[in-house]
């Protein structure tokens, strides 16, 4: 199991946060790197802790393109490469001899990544979900969603596909007999098409129902005391109505959604790259066989797997997610505020506490969208009700 933190010589402390992949992961923080004057030696200091008091193997990855890729070889590393960690953070140090591996000047475009490995293996993701690893990413895009800013996101799971009509119906049927009496029927062009006509409240309640059906702890409650599970009615939930540490299903936050959509790429416009055609995603007049005449519609989830029409490549992104662009707009947890990026937290932002009017974030675009709406950074919001034929969702889970 690994935990990554980043530092830059230009920014003495770029990122410092605790990012658990599970309860006993090692934690690296306060990474600082600086070149020793007159040499090609780079000092790297950091704090490290581990709840299990494991012996950790420390390693370093280095980028010479501002973090886009980490391809600089790092073999000449000395210092605290093996650490007997304790639950209390301890200061440690490494020295990289760049003259051996790089033999160029350490400069402001270089980013250092410190990795602590305890030898543990991550548990497999729940069925139908993928692991989105902890780490930072650049959220936003110049000219689309500004300011572009670095966000640290903790690890979480996300559905590989948008929630299908079949899955919606299965949970809804269980819910109707277990206190979830007002979940709507929804609509879908087929069992394995995404469920449509889902409003935000229904998506949240359905996540709770799915949690209880699978024996997990529900996330959403009817008040800040979190004494009553949210099962019926339309309640404007505050952030303190949410048990963020629960293991049940929930909507992704806007930051989680964008990190997941970008996959393993950096600065990309779409989940697969920077251009789009009808072979990549379902949008207005994209040419798939599910849009006859003037009545376009959804494609089955995961349709763009290499066998789609028009012919194209498998468009699962780097995390294995499908339809993060197109098919249906996807509800996120956050209240929508067009100016939120100017004041959002750097770690695990969960949206503004209040807004002048109630709207929730929608991401990804849909079958009735133009291609601009399908960009990873594109932000939109909608009133929580009603659900319409372009709105759906996928569920997330914490670790």
Language-model-detected regions and their locations in the chain:
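Proline/serine/threonine-rich low-complexity linkers at boundaries of modular beta-sandwich domains
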Residues: 20-27
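Extracellular acidic, Ser/Thr/Pro-rich low-complexity tracts
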Residues: 47-52, 64, 100
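Structural beta-strand segments of beta-rich domains
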Residues: 40-44
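A short glycine-rich, aromatic-capped structural motif
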Residues: 121-179, 194-212, 325-326, 395
């Amino acid at each position: 199991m690994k935990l990554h933190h980043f530092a830059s010589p230009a920014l003495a402390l770029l990122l410092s946060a605790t990012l658990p992949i599970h309860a006993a992961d090692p934690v690296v923080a306060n990474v600082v790197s600086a070149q020793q004057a007159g040499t090609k030696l780079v000092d790297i200091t950091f704090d490290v802790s581990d709840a299990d008091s494991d012996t950790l193997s420390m390693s370093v990855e280095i980028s010479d393109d501002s973090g886009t890729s980490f391809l600089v070889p790092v073999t000449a590393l000395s210092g605290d490469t093996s650490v007997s960690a304790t639950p209390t953070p301890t200061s440690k140090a490494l020295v990289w001899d760049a003259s051996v591996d790089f033999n160029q000047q350490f400069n402001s475009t270089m980013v250092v990544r410190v990795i602590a490995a305890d030898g543990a293996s991550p548990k497999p993701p729940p069925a139908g979900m993928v692991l989105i690893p902890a780490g930072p990413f650049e959220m936003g895009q110049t000219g689309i969603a500004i300011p572009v800013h670095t966000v640290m996101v903790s690890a979480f799971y996300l559905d590989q596909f948008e929630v299908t009509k079949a899955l919606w119906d299965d949970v809804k049927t269980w819910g109707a007999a277990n206190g979830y009496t007002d979940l709507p029927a929804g609509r879908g062009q087929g069992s394995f098409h995404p469920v449509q006509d889902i409003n935000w409240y229904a998506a949240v309640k359905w996540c709770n129902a799915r949690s209880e059906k699978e024996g997990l702890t529900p996330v959403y409650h009817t008040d800040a005391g979190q004494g009553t599970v949210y099962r019926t009615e339309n309640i404007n939930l505050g952030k303190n109505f949410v048990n963020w540490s629960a293991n049940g299903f929930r909507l992704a936050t806007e930051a989680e959604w964008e990190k997941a959509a970008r996959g393993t790429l950096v600065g990309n416009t779409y989940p697969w790259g920077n251009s789009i055609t009808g072979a990549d995603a379902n949008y207005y007049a994209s040419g798939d066989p599910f849009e006859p005449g003037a009545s376009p519609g959804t494609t089955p989830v995961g349709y763009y797997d290499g066998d789609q029409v028009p012919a194209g490549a498998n468009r699962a992104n780097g995390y294995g997610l499908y339809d993060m662009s197109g098919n249906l707009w996807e509800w996120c947890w956050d209240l929508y505020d067009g100016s939120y990026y100017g004041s959002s937290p750097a770690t695990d932002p969960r949206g503004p506490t209040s807004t002048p009017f109630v709207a929730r974030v929608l991401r990804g675009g849909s079958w009735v969208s133009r291609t601009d709406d399908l960009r990873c950074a594109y932000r939109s919001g909608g009133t929580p009700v009603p659900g319409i034929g372009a709105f759906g969702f996928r569920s997330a889970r914490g670790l």
